[in-house]
């Protein structure tokens, strides 16, 4: 069994055994939006998320790992050895220190500091998703995951919307941040120039007269999904045509992330088959 050898072979400083270590304290600060913006970095936790970032071309600045937690995780240990071989700083931590660093209830023993994703926006986006006043990070992350799967060209975060780099949003997106161009816009004046000119804009709205599957999605288009508690902003309502998902049961509306996914995959269906 080569696993213990692989872990021992990683060239790294002495194990961090105190949560007061400055490197740990600096990493913990990345749970705050302000610090993420100041450093232009974020903390990823778990093998799936770190691997997705690396496979998307991201080079981690630092890896933190708990050797005892990886003793029965050969895939993680192999991946860690590859990162070390590539010259990436790998810092071992005690289980207690890693638990203090982690944001999950059951940490997987690996975390990484990486640059904030900044993929270039497309010059001529085919389908744009706008998140408007979506404040739940789980919904935002799930919408990003669905958008990437449905072939959305770009995602724009309107004012008064959750930070897409919130740790819960990152986990819910399952790596979509590293494959999908997105921008956070503090003002609508920043957002509007990023939209394709003359493209129709639609707003998911429970009581709209127009059904989502009666819309022409094959050409360039924009979809706005508003928050569940407060709905979309006045700006979005003025610029977009409302569309609804007809309900057959007694449920009045769907969760924002589910509604967004239903509409996005209708757009994907039309584009894939080139039919309305």
Language model region names:
Residues 7-73, 162:
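Boundary-proximal intrinsically disordered activation/regulatory segments immediately upstream
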Residues 10, 55, 91, 96, ...:
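RNA substrate-binding interface of SAM-dependent RNA methyltransferases
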Residues 46, 135-142, 253-259:
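Amphipathic alpha-helical repeat scaffolds
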Residues 2-6:
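Extreme N-terminal basic, low-complexity initiation segments
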Residues 40, 130-135, 244-252:
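Short pre-catalytic strand/loop immediately N-terminal to key active-site residues, enriched for Gly-Thr
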Residues 79-99:
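A glycine-rich helix N-cap at a beta->alpha junction
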Residues 112, 149-150, 161-177, 234-276:
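Structured adenosyl-cofactor binding patch, chiefly the S-adenosyl-L-methionine
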Residues 203-251:
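Active-site/ligand-binding-proximal alpha/beta "capping" segment
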């Amino acid at each position: 069994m080569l696993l213990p050898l692989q872990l021992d072979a990683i060239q790294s400083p002495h194990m961090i055994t105190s949560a007061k270590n400055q490197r740990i304290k600096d990493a913990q600060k990345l749970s705050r939006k302000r610090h993420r913006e100041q450093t232009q970095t974020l903390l990823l936790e778990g093998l799936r998320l770190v691997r997705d970032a690396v496979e998307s071309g991201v080079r981690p600045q630092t890896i933190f790992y708990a050797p005892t937690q990886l003793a029965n995780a050969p895939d993680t240990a192999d991946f860690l050895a590859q990162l070390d071989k590539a010259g990436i700083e790998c810092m071992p931590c005690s289980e207690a220190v890693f638990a203090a660093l982690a944001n999950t209830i059951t940490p997987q023993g690996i975390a990484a500091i990486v640059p904030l994703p900044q993929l270039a926006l497309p010059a001529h986006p085919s389908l744009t998703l706008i998140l408007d006043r979506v404040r739940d990070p789980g919904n935002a992350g799930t919408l990003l995951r669905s958008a990437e799967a449905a072939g959305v060209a770009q995602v724009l975060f309107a004012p008064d919307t959750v930070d897409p780099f919130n740790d819960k949003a990152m986990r819910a997106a399952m790596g979509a941040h590293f494959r999908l161009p997105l921008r956070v816009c503090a003002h609508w004046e920043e957002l509007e120039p990023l939209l394709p000119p003359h493209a129709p804009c639609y707003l998911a709205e429970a009581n709209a007269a127009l059904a989502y599957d009666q819309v022409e999605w094959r050409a360039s288009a924009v979809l706005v999904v508003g928050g569940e508690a407060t709905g979309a902003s006045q700006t979005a309502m003025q610029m977009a045509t409302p569309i609804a998902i007809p309900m057959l049961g007694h449920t009045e509306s769907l969760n924002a992330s589910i509604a967004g996914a239903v509409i996005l995959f209708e757009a994907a269906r039309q584009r894939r088959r080139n039919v309305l």
